[in-house]
Design a protein with these regions (language model features):
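A compositional/structural signature for long, glycine/proline-rich flexible linkers
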Residues: 26-463
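Residues at the start of alpha-helices and the adjacent loop-to-helix junctions
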Residues: 3, 19, 31-34
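Bacterial N-terminal signal peptides
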Residues: 11-20
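Bacterial N-terminal signal peptides that target proteins for export
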Residues: 1-12
Length: 463
């Protein structure tokens, strides 16, 4: 991709900046501790830059909006042919709007929904998450119009606009308004109603909302995006310069201050134009080693932050931010949904060479106000297990059958076990393949979740 604003500053200005402001990059290499700190402080921004760019700019992404200020709207349920996103699910369908707020505010009109769970989540490059609307707060019973803007939106500073129900300030010029809708696929009539409502979501600029043409958007070249490792070992500092120029930082926030300090050390500061001659030349092999270490730690620690992830600015700790950025950007905070990894009774990894059963009595069911689901993935790519039945999860949305006592037995098996309802069977292909079983609890009773014991998958003995 064409480099962003290369060699912009003329030599005399560069000299002035070097002498007058001390902004030249340090000549020495970063210590291991300094490099690790830089990677940790940057991870959330790299992850969200890749995520948002993938939504808005990558036409091959199955969730692509094909540009900014547009919306991806699903037309049906997801199946195992979707491989571009890890951890897919049909519990909630994704309605993704990508926002460019530089020139003017953007208005999104949301219809009412006939659903137990609908949650609107917003995030910008900093990966702090807000929930402006949710059925957990009584929203989506009637149509709602939300106006989005940032601190740099031209000609607008948050004043009321006739016809707008809520004004919401984003923490950056580029962001996403991510709607999750439980489709209630087990009820054809309700499912059809919710799919119709999804198609009614409307995105327009404030000018368009007021009956005028949209203001022309200034052209902008985005640095290369891809996987997190690709960015860290590629155009890392160019991406970070772009990101900090389009992000609102709070001088009173400790994480913001620490991130800016780490970036300043390598020549990246808000308001500057990227100049490869004035940033630290990082050793890619050292960066790769550091990123792998940070990512591995984040993945290993994910379950430690079930109640501390995907929160607004000021409510996040660095380790929780890294864990959420590594495992899956723009997830739900604990008051909306909690994701639990299901282990085995013998402590061994689940494998498709064997069958398993997960048992829960009525009193052992997850404490969900809305609903819960158990979804099966392969353990390597975290994708659906292909099967002719297109059965990937058990729960109210995908189908479940409780026993007479109100409990449930969920079987993971290559063949449907005798006497087991099809609703409670998760098919696998008999081979040496790691499995991943994930429980999602929507609108959880959080205090009960803190003491609730997750079930274990028990290996079924061969007859």
């Amino acid at each position: 991709m064409q480099r962003f604003l290369r060699n912009w500053v003329i030599a005399s200005l560069m000299l002035f900046m070097a002498i007058g402001t001390g902004n030249t990059a340090p000549a020495r290499d970063l210590t291991d501790a300094e490099l690790t700190n830089l990677v940790k402080r940057s991870y959330q921004y790299v992850a969200l830059y890749n995520t948002l760019s993938g939504f808005a700019l990558n036409d091959k992404n199955p969730f692509s909006t094909h540009g900014w200020n547009k919306t991806y709207k699903p037309t049906g349920l997801t199946d195992h042919t979707v491989t571009a996103i890890a951890g897919p699910n049909n519990d909630t369908l994704y309605v993704i709007s990508t926002l460019d707020l530089r020139k003017e505010p953007v208005v999104i009109s949301y219809p009412s929904f006939d659903s137990k769970f609908v949650s609107l989540e917003t995030s910008s490059y900093d990966h702090y998450c807000e929930i402006p609307l949710s059925t957990t707060k009584g929203d989506f019973r009637k149509p709602t119009r939300v106006l989005y803007y940032s601190a740099r939106t031209e000609g607008y500073n948050g004043q009321p606009v006739p016809g707008i129900d809520q004004v919401f300030q984003m923490s950056g010029d580029f962001g996403s308004a991510f709607l999750r809708v439980m489709p209630q696929a087990n009820d054809p009539k309700v499912f059809a109603s919710n799919m119709k409502a999804i198609q009614a979501v409307k995105v327009e600029t404030l000018s368009e909302f007021q009956g005028r043409p949209a203001k022309p958007v200034d052209p902008l070249t985005f640095p290369a995006y891809g996987t997190d490792m690709n960015v860290f070992t590629g155009d890392f500092l160019e991406v970070m310069q772009f990101v900090v120029n389009h992000t609102t930082f709070d001088p009173a926030d400790e994480m913001d201050r620490a991130a800016l300090a780490a970036l300043k050390q390598v020549g990246v500061e808000p308001g500057k134009k990227y100049d490869p001659t004035k940033v630290t030349q990082l050793d890619k092999a050292r960066v790769e080693k550091s990123v792998k270490q940070v990512a591995d730690e984040g993945q290993a620690n994910r379950n430690n932050y079930l109640f501390d992830s995907f929160r607004p600015k000021g409510q996040m700790q660095l380790d929780a931010m890294i864990a959420q950025s590594v495992m899956g950007p723009v997830g739900q905070p604990a008051d909306q949904a909690i994701y639990v990894q299901i282990g085995t009774s013998d402590g061994q990894p689940t494998n498709a060479k064997y069958d398993y059963v997960v048992r829960m009595t009525k009193d052992q069911l997850p404490p969900a106000r809305a609903f819960w689901s158990m979804t099966l993935y392969d353990g390597d790519k975290y994708l659906f297990i292909p099967n002719p039945q297109k059965k990937y999860s058990v729960g109210e949305n995908a189908g479940q059958k409780l026993d007479v006592a109100g409990g449930i037995e969920i079987y993971i098996a290559a063949e449907q076990p005798p006497g087991v309802p099809s609703e409670n069977w998760l098919p696998i292909n008999r081979k040496d393949q790691r499995l991943n079983l994930r429980l999602r609890v929507y609108d959880p009773e959080t205090e009960k979740m803190k003491v609730w014991q997750a079930p274990k998958a028990v290996r079924v003995a061969k007859p």
